[in-house]
């Protein structure tokens, strides 16, 4: 059971980091240069990871935007 707990914790941490990277890209325009990765398998994995962050950022923004507890400034 501790293994699954640790695995879940690492998964959530990775998702949060990916979402933060997406937010940084959206707010400042700074992004990770995937083209500098030479290994195609690693490049594909990094692209999927960053795309997940974009999706999570979009979903979070849509959810918070529809809530009455938050307002756009």
UniProtKB/Swiss-Prot annotation:
Cellular localization per UniProt: Mitochondrion intermembrane space
Keyword Transferase: no
One GO process term, biological-process aspect: mitochondrial membrane fission
Keywords per UniProt: Autophagy, Mitochondrion
Pfam family, one: Mitofissin
Entry annotated with the keyword S-adenosyl-L-methionine: no
A GO CC term attached to the entry: cytosol
A GO molecular-function descriptor: membrane destabilizing activity
Disruption outcome: Impairs mitophagy. Does not affect reticulophagy, pexophagy, nor the Cvt pathway that delivers the precursor form of the hydrolase aminopeptidase I to the vacuole.
Protein purpose: Mitochondrial fission factor that acts directly on lipid membranes to drive mitochondrial fission required for mitophagy. Directly binds to lipid membranes and brings about lipid membrane fragility to facilitate membrane fission and engulfment of mitochondria by the phagophore.
Quaternary organization: Homooligomer. Found as homooctamer in solution, but binds to membranes either as a monomer, dimer, or tetramer, not as an octamer.
Family membership: Belongs to the ?ATG44? family.
PANTHER family referenced in this protein's UniProt entry, alphabetically: CHROMOSOME 16, WHOLE GENOME SHOTGUN SEQUENCE, DUF1748-DOMAIN-CONTAINING PROTEIN
Name by which UniProt lists this protein: Mitofissin
Organism from which the protein derives: Schizosaccharomyces pombe (strain 972 / ATCC 24843) (Fission yeast)
């Amino acid at each position: 059971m501790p293994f699954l707990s640790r695995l879940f914790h690492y998964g959530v941490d990775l998702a949060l980091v990916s979402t933060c990277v997406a937010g940084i890209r959206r707010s400042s325009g700074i992004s990770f240069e995937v083209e500098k990765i030479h290994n195609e398998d690693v490049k594909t994995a990094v692209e999927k990871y960053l795309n997940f962050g974009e999706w999570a950022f979009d979903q979070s923004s849509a959810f918070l935007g529809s809530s009455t507890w938050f307002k756009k400034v």
